Amino acid sequence: MKDDSAVVPDGVLRVFADKSEIKADGVEEVTFRVMFGSQDVTAETTCTLIRTFEGNQNYMAGGVNKFSTTAPGTYTFKARYYYAGALYSDNEVEVVATPYFTGEEENYLQRVLGVYFTSTGCTSCPTASKGIANLQQAYPGMISIVSFHDDMVVDDPMKIEETAVFKAAFGGFQGLPRLFWNMRNGTDIIGPVFTDSYLEELGQYTPSCGVAVSAAYDENTRKLDIELGIKSNIPASYRYLLFLVEDDVDGYEQAGVNGSYLHQNVIRDVLVKSASGEKINNGLPLPVGSEVKASKSVVLDQSWNADNMRVVVAAMLSSDGGFTFVADNVNECAVGSSVSYLYAE
């Protein structure tokens, strides 16, 4: 990238890009520089790139200056920088992402991951949970929900260590309930109606991959052997998240509800300890159209009801040089069963 600092007047914020065109293959990147006068502020956490695509505006993480995509089209970028107040760039840069096609492209079904935070001490959570269930009924087979429990007023007996890890990944927000789509920051919503936010998330992207899951279970040993597969239309590097969830969990009181209450989508374990996911294929780009597999094993706790449990796997991609990862597609199966790749009709 050439040195543009000399052309930026003092007190002016301006953004530059090293490319005006990239392939929409999830691999090729454009790199930005943000100048405040003669000062390069690109890497500062108070400097944010604002991306606009098809009318939708998204704020990239502070200090991030790389962008790739799997969705062809025209993107515009401007910069915001906090310096005794919010400053915005006096220009925008345009990046065109051209279609990437190898002749082997599959039309994978677009399923969305919903990461939900709730608590037995939250009086508003039952209404939000009902709203999520209504959304799943309206769009059957299209949404996988995983629910982290957290303490609120009282200690929640279904809280796990990973609750704090994933909560931190979303900026350590305050207040419940919260639902995030596809591990994407800024998508959180309290509900209880989630339809608009779900449809907006669908419009953000077209999935580039499919996910298959097998969950073989030994009732005697309670050992669960999980095998997952990812097939991709693009030569991108993927990660994956793997959740064990249980439905119809009873025996715990719920604030805001009189009498018994069944908890759904309760995360019992996360077999990948980073909220960014675990690398697959040793972190190397996936061969287009070829399946790459990974496996995990776990012994189920005696208190968990295997008959009510599911395995949820999300394939993760980064569009900002590996700083953040979001779910590109998700699939799930019951413990003791399997599910193959799903295709749109």
Predicted features and spans:
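Short tyrosine-centred short linear motifs in exposed loops/low-complexity segments
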Residues: 25, 69-79, 236
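Short, conserved sequence motifs used for protein processing/export or organelle targeting and
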Residues: 147-345
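Bacterial Sec-dependent N-terminal signal peptides
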Residues: 1-22, 85-93, 97, 105-109, ...
